[in-house]
Amino acid sequence: MSRTPHAKTPEAAPAEAKAPDPARRSDRSRRAILDAALALVGEVGYNKLTIEAIAARAGVGKQTIYRWWPSKAAVLLDASLALAGDAATADGRAALPDTGDLAADLKQVLRATVDEFNDPAYDAPLRALTAAGATDPELGARFTERLLAPQLALYEDRLRSARAAGDLAGGADLRLMTEMLLGPLTYRWLLRTAPLTHAFADALVDAVLGTA
């Protein structure tokens, strides 16, 4: 008596390999470019920084960079924005601290600003952008709009809260106070007229609030 052969169970088809995610790859390339720009400007300075060097450090082609940015200054601006965003995320900074003690809050933030200005990772790109923005009005406007203006707004918001709480005079000019806090700090950092210290930051707060 012949036996009927058992039908073979069909083998499962091998799982298809997932196709690379273009968006993720683009994000990685973009971040590599920004990191490379920050590293190189600290190593060689802005004048010697080139798109070719950024591309080589990031492991991408020049055209990849030019597809996203028109110039090395534009790359550096976005790199600085990313750096500032990373720092804000790490510190949990969506606003200035509001503990009810205005002087202490402002001193805390200005001391952190002093630390950033004294950190080579921040110093080199910010100096480069400041210099480039002085001769490139469009870049200067973008630098102000995207990096400086949001930071100034945080100070004004904190001062507005203090004014509402009665800690400042009702007619206090919040923009002027903000610039009085940050202007001398930036001047000393940019021109290196004297050491940039926590004591100087504290003195600025005391002077500004003493005249508010």
What are these regions (language model features)?
Residues M1-G59, W68-A74:
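Basic, helix-initiating cap at the start of DNA-binding domains
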Residues M1-P20, A104, Q108-V109, A149, ...:
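C-terminal peripheral helix-coil segments that are non-catalytic and often amphipathic
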Residues Q63:
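Key DNA-contact positions within bacterial/archaeal DNA-binding proteins
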Residues W68-W69, F143, L147, L182, ...:
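Tryptophan-centric aromatic hotspots in well-structured domains and transmembrane helices
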Residues A74-L83:
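Alpha-helical DNA-contacting segments of helix-turn-helix folds
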Residues A90-D123, M177:
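Hydrophobic alpha-helical connector segments
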Residues A95, L110-F117, L126-T135, V205-L209:
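Helix-loop "lid/cap" segments that line or gate small-molecule binding pockets
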Residues A104, D115, D119-A124, P137-A164:
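Amphipathic alpha-helical packing segments from all-alpha helical-bundle domains
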